[in-house]
Design a protein with these regions (language model features):
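Extracytosolic ligand-binding ectodomains
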Residues: 1-144
Length: 144
């Protein structure tokens, strides 16, 4: 991954059309109703698109809301741990799942190529391919 895919960092990418990389979020890539709503509201309130910190915070909030619904509001640590292990939930990126073995949030990634669009002050990550979470062999390194 190229790292640093926050909007201010993408300004420098405008110098590198055709550069390829990977990201876990760019507001124009996920095609789902949750992302559409978040992007629309973010533009309305802030007059700019959300970056991956916004999507990450939104995803964390969705995880908590989903867990509390599934636990009937029981917010005790042990109940939430059991509830969230293996739990899937909707996010701006699409479905995420907490892997039971190590609590890793398994999520899709995006292979992109930078294109230049005069409407944006930054190099635009254009989707080449969505890499499904199931395709990635993320090791489990804990001894649980």
């Amino acid at each position: 991954a190229t790292g640093g895919n926050i909007l201010p960092a993408l300004v420098a990418y405008k110098q590198f059309p055709g550069m390829e990389g990977a990201a876990y979020y760019y507001f124009g890539m996920p095609k789902n109703t949750v992302n559409d709503a978040m992007v629309s509201r973010h533009y309305t309130q802030f007059k700019s698109p959300p970056d991956f910190f916004t999507a990450g915070g939104f995803s964390a909030a969705m995880a908590v809301v989903t867990a509390l619904k599934k636990s009937n509001g029981d917010a005790s640590a042990n109940t939430l741990i059991k509830t969230m292990e293996g739990m899937s939930f909707d996010t701006p990126k699409g479905k995420m799942t907490f892997r039971k073995e190590d609590h890793q949030a398994m999520q899709n990634m995006y292979h992109f190529k930078i294109k230049i669009d005069p409407a944006f002050a930054w190099g635009v990550p254009e989707l080449v391919r969505e890499i499904k979470a199931e395709e990635m062999q993320i090791p489990i390194r804990n001894k649980r």
